[in-house]
Regions:
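An acidic-aromatic pocket/loop used at catalytic or ligand-binding sites
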Residues: 2-6, 17-151
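Sec-dependent N-terminal signal peptides
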Residues: 7-13
């Protein structure tokens, strides 16, 4: 009887320790997205989201589609991410189609570290608590014009 009690107590302690270690293991969320030689801050880094997106990689890694599902306040998370890229990482807003509203989207771009390439980011808001980020490396370059004239 005494041996049975000791074995039961040890089993409970071991099971508790195993459960504690599995529960306390932190998931690693990406801090950066890589597209060839370029890096972009991740949504997880910018917004602190604890969601791992569905990731599709196309065109030999030159296009990444990240879909974030079951995100509360998905529109505000999408806006926060796009604003961060614009204000902190040197992206320019190329198009804005009702961004910040359901089914809205924004396209941002900047010159890649690779000559003759553009890094383009599309952030799309959806209606069902989700949003997507499409990152692509395309041929071209941004030529920015100063609209201020000196008269």
């Amino acid at each position: 009887m005494k041996n049975k009690t000791i074995i039961t107590a040890l089993t409970v302690i071991i099971a508790s320790l195993i459960t504690y270690f599995f529960v306390s293991i932190k998931k690693e969320y990406p801090q950066l997205y890589n597209i060839e030689n370029d890096v972009i801050s991740s949504v997880n880094k910018v917004n602190g989201l604890k969601i791992i997106p569905k990731i599709e990689t196309l065109e030999d890694g030159k296009i990444k589609i990240l879909t974030f599902n079951k995100v509360s306040n998905s529109i505000s998370n999408a806006v926060k991410y796009a604003n961060y890229l614009w204000k902190n990482e040197g992206y320019y807003i190329i198009t804005n189609n009702n961004f910040g509203k359901e089914n809205g989207k924004v396209e941002l771009a900047k010159n890649s570290s690779e000559n003759g390439k553009i890094l383009k980011v599309n952030v799309n808001c959806y209606t069902n608590d989700s949003f997507s980020v499409v990152i692509s490396l395309i041929n071209g370059s941004l030529l920015l014009k100063n609209n201020i004239s000196n008269n």
